[in-house]
């Protein structure tokens, strides 16, 4: 018999009082007193499986929510333009019937929109998802293309040029609706982990790749040396004697080693990306992970400005703050927006800005008001100004100035340093700080969304060409998503 408890802890069921807190006692009470049968309780709680084989007639459109993302994309974008881009890749009068190229592109867009890691998994998800089938124009009984068919087409049929055309077509659609704002462009790079094991690697000696601006730089170096009465450098353009040792993956030779943190390394690619103030990705250049931002900048910048000549401001982080990048942007008639970059040097020593350059006499004045005279211009484009050791060894500030054995201080000044000074003047101009601060909500947000929501943290494809196509398709899908949400 159930013990009596306070009223608030008891429950009246069928005229009988049971305890609220003790399900075991409650069930025992009900079971032995016959107030509620066990089958009746199961009938209230259990969902049967009798309907699994039941046949129904329904309309797929009714099962896709009105506010579903794919509905918005289908309304905003006309994918029939893809037929024109791939028309030359198909033969109209021979061969077996092919899969619809628009369906293939839509399936890959679904993969990138929802961050599905593989094409095999993508086909499985589409096979069971009503909204995905509705987006493709397939009924629930229609057979989907095999995942190998999609893979083969994007590996062999659709080239980098085809994917680039699709990417720019999406941008043209956005620009046609006045949603693209290319006046200020935000540039940065992000690393993508490659499908390669760090243990499968070899050491290789390769020739040092010449930078695009080296020829122009050498001309100005020789001109400066000639003005100072020095001999010109005679460099052979075909000289391949300069080499460097690199770590190469045997799995994916196109990727490069990226130092992730102080002790961790990984094979990776880097996506050098540009976007506008609304977060629409305007262009991307994929390089191995060991290529510095400033090295990949020139070719990528030329292509970007050719596509969008209305660019006025180029916003970049400290990785792009080099004389070559500053010269490239300023000479093109645009304004580089760069941050403050802390100077290198030992603590307690004089900073580079403590040494004042006298343009009229072409010399440098040290903090102790002594003159450092011009010595030479080296092959890297730096003019060297050196002090007199006899004067320096008696200087009371020698310890703060230099630790060289011969007590001689050398100050380096790049022949394009005037462009760096212009970037500092621009940095202090009204409105530039606010413009630079928008990086976190534009380009950094693009990278965060791509990695967290769209599966760009690592890639399963291999080779620079395939990774480039993979990244462009992912960014095209992100642009389509943003465009559809803005026009909804």
Q: Where is each model-derived feature located?
A:
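Basic, short loop/linker segments at the boundary and entry of helix-turn-helix/winged-helix-like folds
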Residues: 66-109, 114-115
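Hydrophobic alpha-helical membrane-insertion signals
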Residues: 36-71
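Anion-binding and metal-coordination hotspots
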Residues: 41, 46-49, 108, 115-128, ...
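Polybasic, lysine-rich low-complexity intrinsically disordered segments
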Residues: 7-9, 13, 21-22, 31
